Regions:
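PLD/PLD-like phosphodiesterase catalytic module centered on the HKD motif
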Residues: 1-37, 41-166
Length: 166
């Protein structure tokens, strides 16, 4: 706790493996109160796990103002590998958006998930499992928020809640 009895002091934990990284993502999702911003090259199959599905669904059900924004370089496998996430998109189309980066943003290589602009999981490169879990880090969160807003602006909708066809 801080000296004035407010919010807990910021904490950081080094992550050295994929399992630690995936567990850290679940930790940050569970801590979210208002918004989740996710950037990655592509989404791992963990986004189809029952645990992650429940965490995201509970977050979206907690308040109608809660939002999840996802930007990926490669969204093509989401329908195939993450049908639970696609179901969430259909159920919460007003609160969940999945975008694809435009070519000008494809050189961004460090995935991160940001919750409420203060807690995050940040990998240093998408080909490496090393990263950091930070809770209550306003400064680091604001830096990632600025980067996320730039990535979001350089992206277009990738998946729709509806299926169009003939």
């Amino acid at each position: 706790m801080d000296p004035e009895g407010g919010a807990p002091a910021p904490s950081q934990q080094r992550l050295d493996g994929v399992a630690e990284y995936e567990t850290a993502i679940d930790t940050v999702i569970a801590s979210a109160q208002r918004n989740l911003r996710i950037f990655d090259r592509s989404l791992s199959r963990e986004y189809n796990s029952p645990r992650r599905y429940d965490l995201l669904r509970d977050f979206l059900l907690a308040s109608r103002v809660n939002r999840v924004q996802i930007v990926v370089h490669e969204p093509d496998g989401i329908h195939r590998d993450c049908p639970r996430l696609v179901n969430l998109l259909k159920q919460f189309s007003h609160a969940l958006a999945i975008h694809r980066t435009q070519p000008r943003a494809r050189r961004v290589y460090d995935p991160f998930l940001l919750a409420d602009d203060v807690s995050y999981v940040h990998r240093f490169h998408y080909d490496q499992p090393r990263g950091v879990l930070a809770l209550g880090d306003l400064n680091g969160g604001q830096e990632l928020l600025g980067r996320y807003e730039e990535i979001w602006e350089a992206s277009d909708p990738a998946l729709s809640a509806t299926t169009l066809g003939l």
